[in-house]
Design a protein with these regions (language model features):
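A motif-centric signal for short, conserved binding hotspots located
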Residues: 1-42, 46-170
């Protein structure tokens, strides 16, 4: 997992435990979440924006009167995750013209660096015996962290005196 939604649900990358995009496996609810396969608790693999829907994590109503897409979660590196920029509706919102980097984030006033849910990436799946299909991925955090991991509590071992020693053993 790589973050937490403001609802308390845990965020996971686009790929599931079988290294298949969860969206392609049609195992997610309309809000981009599911109860983990193999007994895991509820978590989200995809952005849960729905324009007019009632099942989405956030909808058009969350944009009304706002200067920026709504806050939807935080990466475990402490960086905020905001909702998608809707392509044909949000040109007036702060940061709309600032491209997202490889981590799915950007920096602009007054927020500083932050992530955005994103729908700009395409994925083509080839399944034996079926035609290849290309679709847009509804990603939350892309999987890598832009934030300063050394500032995340307990992420690095302080006992060794080496701040670059990760607890994961690398």
């Amino acid at each position: 997992d790589n973050g937490i939604m403001i609802s308390g649900a845990v965020m996971f990358p686009v790929y599931n435990n079988r290294l298949m995009p969860s969206q392609a496996d049609a195992e997610l609810s309309a809000n981009g979440c599911h109860v983990g396969q193999g007994g895991g608790g509820p978590h989200c693999h995809a952005d849960g924006y729905e324009s007019q829907g009632v099942l989405g994590v956030y909808t058009d109503a969350d944009y009304e009167g706002k200067e920026h897409p709504p806050l939807v979660g935080f990466g475990y590196d402490g960086v905020a995750l905001f909702g998608v920029y809707r392509e044909d509706q949000d040109s007036q919102l702060e940061g709309f013209g600032t491209a997202l980097d490889a981590w799915g984030g950007h920096e602009h006033d007054p927020l500083g660096y932050h992530y955005h849910a994103d729908r700009s990436k395409s994925l083509t799946l080839s399944i034996p015996g079926a035609a290849a299909a290309t679709y847009r991925v509804r990603s939350l955090i892309l999987g890598a962290y832009k934030g300063k991991l050394t500032g995340t509590p307990y992420f690095v071992s302080k006992k060794s005196g080496n701040d670059a020693t990760f607890l994961g053993g690398i």
